Amino acid sequence: MKTQSHAIVTLAFLLTFGAASAQTKWDLPTAYPASNFHTENIVAFAAEVDKATGGKLKIQVHANASLFKAPEIKRAVQGGQAQLGEMLWVNYENEDALFGIDGVPFLATSYGEAMKLWRASRKSLEAHLEKQGLRVLFSVPWPPQGIYSKRTINSVADMKGLKWRAYSPATARIAELVGAQPITIQAAEVTQALATGAIDSMMTSGATGYDTKVYETVKNFYDTQAWLPKNVVIVNQKAFDALDKSAQSAVLKAAAAAETRGWTTSEEKTGWYLDQLRKNGMNVAAPSPTLKADMRKIGDAMLADWLKKSGGEGKAVVDAYRKM
């Protein structure tokens, strides 16, 4: 009996150990809060992968820069410290000019235009990341960008001297062009930076404004709808290749669904975010004709600069986009 019992226990152990060893666990850091629609979409993506693989691939989402800060995420995925990660394309424009294409003011100002720009640029962007051992899974836009300011702004002249949050090379360049002071502040630090007076203005979406409770310290939002920057979820190519074919298929299928869902949610929530800002006492308004014209001139100058930096490849992407 003892021999039989030992055999049963040993078999049970082997079965349990085998199941455990067959399970793969991945970490996915993101810089945004758990309540943000991007993060919620990523959590849904992870759940779909878990279900499709029968629990063999578990993806742990680390929100609000709890595992890596925004500027660290891409390198962490490249180095295998995290298997996946979410990054903002425009944050890496200094590394690769093409990454800044959706941060050029007024190049694409609606969801329809943003989708055309993504279709025109996707293959090139994917190829650039592939050279770094990274694979694009899905990319989702933020709502259109507008100007938050403690100061009333009727023209670019009113922006001189503002302490301007810069989250990307493009937003830093805007600050320089309008005579503001660019200050690098990550999304997770915005609330504190506004409360302490480290910054008094920024250009970002209604979503970020709502998430960071900008309305507690800032009263003006000018809905310039200047551009729709995208986040992208990337995976370490070696980690992806280590999966069996069925798991790879599950990841890609869930990623395609997440991209479709993310674009729909982003567009659907755009108006809702602005309504929440209004309900919390903010003045949400269209830019004055003068401010709009001034910002368009800045956009034209920045597009010319970007085309010089990105060379023939950048021009080809913009030309393809404009023909769509």
Where are the predicted features?
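Bacterial N-terminal signal peptides that target proteins for export
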Residues: M1-V9
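Bacterial N-terminal signal peptides
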Residues: I8-G18
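Short beta-strand-centered segments that line the small-molecule binding cleft or hinge
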Residues: K116
